[in-house]
Amino acid sequence: MVENKYQWKNWAENQSCSPDGIFTPINEEELLYSVRQAIKESQKVKAVGTGHSFTGTALTNGYLIDLSKYDKILSVDPNLNQVTVQVGKKLEHLSPELWDHGLAMSDLGDIAYQSVAGAISTGTHGTGLTFGCLATQVVAARVITGEGEIVECSMVERPDLLRAAVVG
């Protein structure tokens, strides 16, 4: 799960860093371990999806959490038109899987190679006056705090945390 001697580059290779550690969790338990290990070792943490941003926002000399393998659909509710998905899921893979359940995202950005987390946290948007950015489609989230605890938030429960978490 953690690699040694680290180098990370974004997709365009115009941003790179040498973090002290890279974690690649595949489930919530490993993700939580990654954050708690960083806390224990007084390391800063940055999370990345596909690295499809041109900016240096993902760069760190602390711990980098690579979410590319944290990419499963956990549940689908066609009656509510809702899906629960791990944030490393690429949009290019999410769309056809939603289609298999008779669902689709109401709005997509221009880049399908982004992860769900990247598209949401960077304010990715499509077109049209009636469509918000992808973050407006998020109705609930599980957030790991700086203390290493999981907090659930939604538009009903802790709505301020949800709004802060989705475009960050």
Label the model's feature ranges.
Residues 2-12:
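N-terminal regions that are enriched for targeting/export leaders
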Residues 6, 26, 89, 156-157:
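Short coil/turn linker and secondary-structure boundary residues
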Residues 16-110, 123-128:
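Glycine-rich N-terminal segment of FAD-binding domains in flavoprotein oxidoreductases
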Residues 55-57, 115-118, 132:
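Short secondary-structure boundary/hinge segments and terminal tails
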Residues 78, 115, 145:
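Short, acidic, Ser/Thr-enriched surface-loop or helix-capping motifs
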Residues 93, 115-117, 139:
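An acidic, phosphate/nucleotide-engaging active-site surface
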Residues 107, 119-168:
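FAD-binding subdomain of flavoenzyme oxidoreductases
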